[in-house]
């Protein structure tokens, strides 16, 4: 009954003009909103586009995207490299690719450090990331700040359901760079980084955090994602209708038919251009440049540039001294099987 009442109410309001939530639908309008008392909790939704300036390819860009450059692995089709059934039979292509993309070879970008500033200023409610490169962690976001929707290289587990032995980042790194297929020390089954493959469950944390976070968000900041992968893409519709949404991306994303989206329970998508637009802003270009532009409007530009410079210098110093990340040296341990309420990935879901 509540669904029907809500559906009827939304249907009647489709043609009504909502009051704008920003004084203008521009980056400047978003900046002024962020400086007001109304903006206290920001959720970031991020994808591969925030890491490309670090040298990590995205998945879909023509010629330079990951899926256009997998010929050397002789896969039956590009997506097979992230299919759990193919991985269990032929793990070598994935681990060869993992060596090229392994965390620790790249530095966080301006986008990552902009989110760090949001955290330091007490504005970051949560970062939901599709990325598996752990750059958010390297930039200073902590476990509590993150929802790694498509998993992470940070930990790995034995694929045997009866074992599930856990291994730290340092253990997996040694195996990958030695070009040794990682095998469990207990049962000799394959060990896989905790990234979400086709046919695997999303982390339960994705759903538990989503249910509470989006009830209290004041601003949704979407960066570097095509918003094509479900259920991550549906997160933009979880924000209340009274919450502004800013997209920083090379092209517009997340737009959909409002009536169809409402019927399917996935909201109306982004509306940047219609006469009824009232809360959505798109800044088109490189994500780093978008964050710099926003930081300048907020009066944070020098602080952001200094943070990037200081943190990159620290990473370089640690690399030169061979200092390991202390958070990657934990001992292997057992983990319980995944929770039963974790949802399965769809065919379109893939690490991004």
UniProtKB/Swiss-Prot annotation:
Gene Ontology molecular function, alphabetical: chromatin binding; histone deacetylase activity; histone H4K16 deacetylase activity, NAD-dependent; metal ion binding; NAD+ binding; NAD-dependent protein demyristoylase activity; NAD-dependent protein depalmitoylase activity; NAD-dependent protein lysine deacetylase activity
InterPro entries given in the database record: DHS-like_NAD/FAD-binding_dom (IPR029035), NAD-dep_sirtuin_deacylases (IPR050134), Sirtuin (IPR003000), Sirtuin_cat_small_dom_sf (IPR026591), Sirtuin_class_I (IPR017328), Ssirtuin_cat_dom (IPR026590)
Disulfides per UniProt: none
Domain of life: Eukaryota
Positions with a binding annotation for Zn(2+): 158, 163, 184, 187
Location of region: Disordered: 314-352
Organism: Pongo abelii (Sumatran orangutan)
Subcellular location(s) per record: Nucleus; Cytoplasm, Perinuclear region; Cytoplasm; Cytoplasm, Cytoskeleton
Known regulation of activity: Inhibited by Sirtinol, A3 and M15 small molecules. Inhibited by nicotinamide. Inhibited by a macrocyclic peptide inhibitor S2iL5. Inhibited by EP300-induced acetylation.
Catalytic residues of the enzyme: 150
This protein's name: NAD-dependent protein deacetylase sirtuin-2
SUPFAM superfamilies with a match to the protein in the record: DHS-like NAD/FAD-binding domain
Enzyme class: transferase
Cofactor(s) needed for function: Zn(2+)
